[in-house]
């Protein structure tokens, strides 16, 4: 009888990078000491993957949709809905959801799009104050997510989804006016303008910001709203398509939401924050535990992306080393003959760009049944030589499922 293996997909968010002078011309992944991933590279196979298509910078939402095997051009209906699912909200198809950043506004200019990366606890307290004190004449839900992130849901307003953002997407610029394309979205734009104004009044006087002022930290006195989203068009759940039980170990709301939308059970172990202070070993232990009961486990590690956005190459390398130790724990507790492991990023976040780019992402697959190549280390340049070649993100899961002996033959 053919062995049906388990699958473990590990995403190191924003993993891919470009050569950096500060790192002697290496990328953070090449600069980092990664004995466990290098061991897997030696016994596995490397390649590169374009989350969407070559040269196309991918959002974390569209990238994960693609990596889970979906066509984002067909399924994607905006980021906000995934954010809302990720914070545990069960929404209807009539609701309109948005991603929100707590930000710092000084003299009409956004000086910090993440309000000094305020903590999750601070964001949740500020969100509760806004929910309790702001009245805009329509039903809404405002809830803190991870770190500086929050979610806004306008109940019953899905027809106004053609509304723009007020986020200029870089510091040093004023907030944008909400654009709109029709009467429904014009109404939503007006509601959002009122919401932002009233929320700002609450934030300016909140004790958290009074304390941050005294401490010389950026205050969270403004809301940047983006990514209007309605119910995604998911034709078939991941679990139905592949006939597997699937679980995710995830801290970040957006990625939780994508996983929930396609049928994953989602777990967030204590100490897993999605921030620099996350407890990656708690994630490793949870993944090992879940592999006993689930056929396919997805583990998401966020901080590498944040270091790219913050242009901190040495920190990004250190975080990759932490992720490698996390992977080492997993390797000590699984039988590689019975598990197929894939490691990649959802996209590249080069430090010099401080944002997502269209660079391909290194990909490693190892475990039972995997053909090997001649690569010895996991890095961008080694990945170019790998036997997998250059594939698209949506090819990863089918390749894994085939190696797990869970794919069905096409044709007679």
UniProtKB/Swiss-Prot annotation:
Query: Care to name a GO molecular-function term for this sequence?
Result: metal ion binding
Give the main EC class. isomerase
Would you say which domain of life the source belongs to? Archaea
Question: Catalytic activity annotated for this protein?
Answer: (2R)-2-phosphoglycerate = (2R)-3-phosphoglycerate
Q: Which UniProt keywords apply?
A: Glycolysis, Isomerase
The pathway noted for it is: Carbohydrate degradation; glycolysis; pyruvate from D-glyceraldehyde 3-phosphate: step 3/5
Q: Which InterPro entries match?
A: Alkaline_phosphatase_core_sf, ApgAM_prokaryotes, Metalloenzyme, Pglycerate_mutase_ApgM, Pglycerate_mutase_ApgM_sf
Q: Which GO terms describe its biological process?
A: glycolytic process
Role summary: Catalyzes the interconversion of 2-phosphoglycerate and 3-phosphoglycerate.
Q: Which family does it belong to?
A: Belongs to the BPG-independent phosphoglycerate mutase family. A-PGAM subfamily.
> What is this protein's name?
2,3-bisphosphoglycerate-independent phosphoglycerate mutase
Q: What's the source species for this entry?
A: Pyrococcus horikoshii (strain ATCC 700860 / DSM 12428 / JCM 9974 / NBRC 100139 / OT-3)
């Amino acid at each position: 009888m053919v062995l049906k293996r388990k699958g473990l997909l590990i995403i190191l968010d924003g993993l891919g990078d470009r050569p950096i002078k500060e790192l002697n011309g290496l990328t953070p992944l090449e600069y980092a000491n990664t004995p466990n991933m290098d061991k897997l590279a030696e016994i596995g196979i490397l390649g590169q993957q374009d989350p969407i298509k070559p040269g196309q910078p991918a959002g974390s939402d569209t990238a994960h949709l693609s990596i889970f095997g979906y066509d984002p051009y067909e399924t994607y209906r905006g980021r906000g809905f995934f954010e809302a699912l990720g914070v545990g909200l069960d929404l209807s198809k009539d609701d309109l959801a948005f991603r929100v950043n707590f930000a710092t506004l000084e003299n009409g200019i956004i000086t910090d799009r993440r309000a000094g990366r305020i903590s999750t606890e601070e964001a949740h307290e500020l969100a509760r104050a806004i929910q309790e004190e702001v009245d805009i004449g329509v039903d809404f839900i405002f809830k803190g997510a991870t770190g500086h992130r929050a979610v806004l849901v306008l109940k019953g307003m899905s027809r106004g989804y053609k509304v723009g953002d007020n986020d200029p997407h870089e510091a040093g610029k004023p907030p944008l006016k909400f654009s709109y394309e029709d009467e429904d979205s014009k109404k939503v734009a007006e509601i959002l303008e009122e919401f932002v104004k009233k929320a700002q009044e609450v934030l300016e006087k909140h004790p958290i910001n009074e304390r941050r002022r005294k401490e010389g930290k950026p205050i969270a006195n403004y809301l940047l709203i983006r990514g209007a989203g309605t119910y995604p068009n998911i034709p078939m759940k991941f679990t139905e398509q592949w006939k597997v039980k699937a679980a995710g170990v995830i801290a970040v709301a957006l990625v939780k939401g994508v996983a929930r939308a396609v049928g994953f059970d989602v777990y967030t172990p204590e100490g897993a924050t999605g921030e620099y202070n996350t407890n990656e070993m708690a994630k490793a232990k949870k993944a090992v535990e879940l592999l006993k009961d689930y056929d396919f486990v997805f583990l998401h590690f966020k901080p590498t992306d944040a270091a790219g956005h913050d242009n901190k190459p040495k920190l990004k390398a250190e975080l990759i080393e932490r992720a490698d130790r996390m992977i080492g724990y997993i390797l000590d507790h699984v039988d590689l003959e019975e598990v197929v492991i894939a490691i990649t990023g959802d996209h590249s976040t080069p430090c010099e760009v401080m944002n997502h780019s269209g660079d391909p992402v290194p990909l490693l697959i190892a475990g039972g049944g995997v053909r090997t190549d001649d690569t010895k280390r996991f890095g961008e340049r080694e990945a170019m030589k790998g036997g997998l070649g250059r594939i698209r993100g949506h090819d990863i899961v089918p390749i894994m499922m085939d190696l797990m002996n869970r794919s069905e033959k096409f044709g007679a």
